[in-house]
Amino acid sequence: GVLLRAVDALLQLTDADGEFFPLNDGQKGMSWHTSSLVTAVNVAFLVGGEDPRLLGIAEEQGQVLLDDAGIAVARAIRDGKSQAFEKRSVNLSDGSDGTQGGVAVLRYGDDDLTLVFKYAAQRLSHGHYDKLSFSLYEKGDEVLQDYGLVRFVNIEQKGGGNYLPENRSWAKQTVAHNTLVLNETSHFEGKYEIGSQHHSDLWFYDDSSPDVQVVSATETNAYPGTAIRRTLAMIKDDAFEKPLVLDILKVDSGQENRYDLPFYYFGQVMKVNFEYDSPDSLVPLGEKSGYQHLYLEGVGKPASESTRFSWMDDGRFYTLTSATDAGDELLLTRLGANDPDFNLRRDPAFMIRRDGVADTVFATTIETHGSYSPVSERALNTNSSIAGLEIVHDSDDYTAVAITGVAGQVSLFIVANSESGASQGHVLTLGDRSYKWAGPYRYGPR
């Protein structure tokens, strides 16, 4: 039973193209076509009750073992028993007893949109300092990326194919991931001896509704004296062309800090709604903890309470909308500083910096929309459907975020901060209206 569940978990941790999500020191491009997964699928089929869904994977792999397991798979495919392997939303717990955090994968449709949320344990020397980080995929293409590792495996010209120095100075560092950094210092001070003692904790996971799927987890040890809770929701609403992601990151700290929240995207910037200055010469953003590898390409200030950043990649449009404060800085960065051997990709990022505050909330939506065809030269639905994003309430008990569409409709997402039971009743009064619901969150009209 354990082996079969392990094979299923491996297959669930792949994108639409069968490539594994590059968690920790994972290599991008590694997929279920590798020989070890051919073996795993064949053996699991033979000894695990001949699950016909595994035949769908075997057909994708295009090869079988030359033994009893492979013959069983080949015959079953020949006899027309194959079924498609269903990718589903799943929450995988970490640790020998399943209590050391985990990895959650939220999916909409046939991998139309896939979110990977990592709140796991450190995982030995290959682990990264990336608590509560996430990545986002659309049909197998990275929208917001996890960098992966800095190694050119078995390519002799690059360090003999071994791990390169930048794997430690960049890829493992917190700022290399889509997660929160305090005071330009990595989680656990970037020390394995500290990180290996801790893990994040699940607050709740709910995929019972295909239209609103939510995962929430808490980290209290990455920065002593600071509690971070991140709630990620994948929402399919008729007001928007495609599903959108809502990201609520709540911080409670005993001291004022500098907070940096980066988002690593691909493609070409289309439009922003804030003014920014580009330096005459590029300089590193910092001196350590990965910051020494980031060039600062632009810096600006929010022009409104909702900051908008849009880009295009591979014929698709994306918009990030964030509820920003007037004192925030908006940074445009690019990887490549202090990299004399060109071991790093030149990847861009949009970073929100909030300085001199203790308790705070970051609220952000990531929206996929529209398309562009160079053949027809037609650009469709290039603009965001979100007019504004506002944190309308934050307390020890609840955080509420209002999403306003361009047509004027307003949706309200409320997450419970003190009780996460599935049947727990809640009441929150905002202005002259009270909202009642059961469970750890509420989404609906305002």
Predicted feature locations:
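Aromatic-lined, polymer-binding surfaces characteristic
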Residues: 1-14
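Carbohydrate-binding/catalytic loop surfaces
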Residues: 20-46
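Catalytic and substrate-binding regions of extracellular carbohydrate-active enzymes
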Residues: 46, 52-284, 358-364, 368-371
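Short, hydrophobic/proline-enriched secondary-structure or compact coil segments at domain edges
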Residues: 216-218, 305, 309, 396-406
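Short, hydrophobic/aromatic-enriched beta-strand segments in well-ordered soluble domains
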Residues: 263, 316-337, 360-372
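Polysaccharide-binding surfaces and accessory modules of carbohydrate-active proteins
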Residues: 264-325
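A surface-exposed beta-strand-loop module
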Residues: 341-360
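Non-catalytic terminal regions with compositionally biased, polar/charged low complexity
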Residues: 354-361, 366-446
